[in-house]
Curated annotation (Swiss-Prot):
UniProt-recorded name of the protein: CRISPR-associated endoribonuclease Cas2 2
InterPro entries (UniProt xref): CRISPR_associated_Cas2, Virulence_VapD/CRISPR_Cas2
Cofactor: Mg(2+)
GO biological process, one term: maintenance of CRISPR repeat elements
Species annotation: Chloroflexus aurantiacus (strain ATCC 29366 / DSM 635 / J-10-fl)
């Protein structure tokens, strides 16, 4: 199932630990504090447990959304890059 993990974590070290966990589970960074990818239900639970351990003792808001393939394929994406220099 397609998953989206988003988070708001003020502590730099805890935030990096969450990013590392998402990467360890094969998710791709789609924004600074957002990762997406395909995870089984078992891996969803395991990742969320790992994230919970990594943010222990820190302020954190972490959300994991699960989408069926139809909903995921219907999403709209706008990505632009400019040379803002």
């Amino acid at each position: 199932m397609q998953c989206l993990v988003i988070y708001d974590i003020p502590n730099d070290r805890a935030r990096q630990r969450v990013a590392d966990a998402c990467l360890d589970y094969g998710l791709q960074r789609i924004q600074y504090s957002a990762f997406a990818g395909n995870l089984s239900r078992t891996h969803q639970r395991a990742l969320f447990g790992e994230i919970t351990r990594r943010v222990k003792g820190h302020t954190a808001n972490v959300q994991l959304f699960v989408f069926d393939s139809k909903t995921w394929s219907d999403r709209r994406i706008l990505e632009q890059q400019y040379d803002d220099a």
